[in-house]
Structures are given as C-alpha cells and as structure tokens.
Amino acid sequence: MSVYIIARVKIHDRNEYDKYSAGFSVVFKKFDGKMLSVDEDPTVLMGNWDDTRSVIIEFPSKKSALAWMTSEDYQAIAKHRDAGSTAHSILVNGLE
C-alpha cells in the first residue's frame, strides 16, 4: 500500500536548507520515493498554516518510507534541513 509524507517547512536559513535540497534527490530515489508536490505558497483553506513550504511525497510502502527517513545517507543531509528550517511531517496510508 502506498504511503504519503506530508510536510510543512518554515525555512529560516536558505543557505543551510539549500545544502539539504542539493543532496535530497539522490537519496530519495534510492528508496523509490516520488515527489508529488512542493509549494512555496499554498492556499490555506482552513485553520492556520504559518509555514512557507508544503511538500507531499509518496513511497510504495511504509517500510520504504521509514527506511528512507532512518537511512545513514538521509540522516547525513537532514542535519542541514534541521539547521535551516523548522519542519513538521506526518506519514499517512493511501487508500487501496
């Protein structure tokens, strides 16, 4: 069953975040991830959405998504994400 990671990101140091972005695709592809949406200015329909970037990504399984998140390669670039942004993310199951 496909799963989706939905992330909200507030970038506060573009230089650090760009280092994260530069290594992201290479690591992401190793785990069969698929980028569905990256939006710097999403339309808020309900509630507060103070973050500047919204991201939706797909993985073929929860196992694949968690393997990506915990991999050494991803953790090596995630330090730049953490230094350059404040992020919140959730993993949700797709409908089958």
Feature-to-residue mapping (PLM):
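Short S/T/G/P-rich N-terminal loop/turn motif that feeds into the first structured element of a domain
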Residues: 1-54, 58-70, 74, 93-96
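Electropositive, surface-exposed helix/loop patches at the edges of structured domains
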Residues: 68-86
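C-terminal end-helix/capping segment
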Residues: 82-96
